[in-house]
């Protein structure tokens, strides 16, 4: 297993959601620096009590859901990357030759926004809290894009939020992940290294396991009560002409194997499907095609993954992290 540096919670910037909502110029500057230099930052939610209450409520709901028998959960399997249930061991994992070891449940933003009638029962039964939480986090991430656009001097159709029009189809979704307790890693482990496909990711978890890759090696990203972890995805990196950093990360047990059930809530903001940008090779691609190619690559074997840069978004070469320096 790779050498992992000690916790780096003090090394990542902590930004105030309240100050960003208030359009504080200094906080917006710090936001840009964090997204360009680290690609990750902590977002202080402690002034937003309802958001934290809703997170705790959703966590309890999803724990009960994941504890249901597999055959019951498989009724929500839609064979989709944005909707429904997916069992463990469907993609390549952290260890060579072994699959991942997490299960997930996804709720599409398109479904919630459009109030479709075919939502999974667990969502339909608790629609108020799912709807309120997703809409608030969605608005927070659009606000963050607006602050980045403003600070970088981007105008009109060139603003980042203009690629996220509300009425257009998108791969955006709310995802819940469970890394089940294990006695061994022989059946799979963790979540393989990757960059996120979309614009911004909003993570909440009270348990350790998330690591990001730096030029010095793998570093823990410590959970902090009352804070979300936000990170830049490939689409935002490409839309920013690679000024902003989509950083490689993974999830691993803290010890030799997963000693307790680990839960994560993730909101993945992604551009509208037809948004177009240049990828790492300079090719024009749509957000939908980049998303679909990347998720197909997640399911490929480790040997197949080594023949393409898409899983790491072009941020790794010969097992080394590529760092793009930000000049203020």
UniProtKB/Swiss-Prot annotation:
Q: Which Gene3D superfamilies does its entry note?
A: B-lactam Antibiotic, Isopenicillin N Synthase, Chain
Species in which this protein is naturally found: Glarea lozoyensis (strain ATCC 20868 / MF5171)
EC number of the protein: 1.14.-.-
Q: State the free-text cofactor note.
A: Binds 1 Fe(2+) ion per subunit.
Query: Which annotated residues bind Fe cation?
Result: 194, 196, 249
PROSITE patterns the record matches: FE2OG_OXY
Under the heading InterPro entries, the entry gives: DIOX_N (IPR026992), IPNS-like_FE2OG_OXY (IPR044861), IPNS-like_sf (IPR027443), Iron_ascorbate_oxido_reductase (IPR050231), Oxoglu/Fe-dep_dioxygenase_dom (IPR005123)
The molecule here is called 2-oxoglutarate-dependent dioxygenase gloE
Q: Function of this protein?
A: 2-oxoglutarate-dependent dioxygenase; part of the gene cluster that mediates the biosynthesis of pneumocandins, lipohexapeptides of the echinocandin family that prevent fungal cell wall formation by non-competitive inhibition of beta-1,3-glucan synthase. The 10,12-dimethylmyristoyl side chain is synthesized by the reducing polyketide synthase gloL/GLPKS4. The thioesterase gloN/GLHYD exclusively interacts with gloL/GLPKS4 to maintain turnover of the polyketide side chain.
Q: Name one GO molecular function term.
A: metal ion binding
Cited Pfam families: 2OG-FeII_Oxy (PF03171), DIOX_N (PF14226)
Q: Which UniProt keywords apply?
A: Dioxygenase, Iron, Metal-binding, Oxidoreductase
**Residues binding 2-oxoglutarate, per UniProt:** 262
Query: Which SUPFAM superfamilies does the record cross-reference, listed alphabetically?
Result: Clavaminate synthase-like (SSF51197)
Q: Which family does it belong to?
A: Belongs to the iron/ascorbate-dependent oxidoreductase family.
Give cofactor(s), names only. Fe(2+)
UniProt GO BP: small molecule biosynthetic process
Where the record annotates domain Fe2OG dioxygenase, the positions are 170-271
